[in-house]
Amino acid sequence: MSDAAPTVRAQVALFADGHLLCVRHRKSGDDYLVLPGGHLEPGETLWEAACREMREETGLEILEGRLWALSEFHAGARHVVDCTFYATSWSGRPRLGTDPETEFQPMTLVGIEWLDREAFAEAAFRPTLLARWLRAHWESPDAPAAYLGVESP
């Protein structure tokens, strides 16, 4: 394990009419789905980062929400802590935004998608630990906040 501090990310789970909002990323020809989210900026709270990332990537404003899940990812020297918020109130119409974090990386934000439970079960969603949590709590989004554990490749 690395001595470097972990990277902390904030992301948002937004459900509407039985569908979950996801963003599609492409990296080295590999397409996969994630929740809208990203890294904290200096001086930013987790909640502020989650709201900013949702706005940047989808154009939606998150008005209210709560912490829903914490998980970790370890791969070699890389350690990421993901903080997932559940959006309870939002405004706007979704549109494909930008992901400034990928500007100088070989990863691109290529789409936004609303997935129903069946489509989500078949989707290439990352991280898989969070995907299992989302599938298990699809019908009960008011589940208490939980620590999901550590995912390693």
Q: How should these model regions be labeled?
A:
Residues 21, 29-30, 74, 121:
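Flexible, glycine-rich phosphate/dinucleotide-binding loops
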Residues 40-63, 72-126:
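Unchanged
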Residues 30-33, 102-153:
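Nudix hydrolase/Nudix homology domain
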Residues 1-21, 39:
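Conserved N-terminal beta-strand and adjoining loop/helix that marks the start
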Residues 25:
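Short loop/turn segments immediately following the C-termini of beta-strands
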Residues 28-33, 77-79:
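A conserved beta-turn-beta hairpin within the catalytic core of GNAT-like acetyltransferases
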Residues 35-37:
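Thr-Gly-centered strand-to-loop micro-motif
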Residues 68-69:
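Local beta-strand/beta-hairpin segments that build beta-sheet-rich folds
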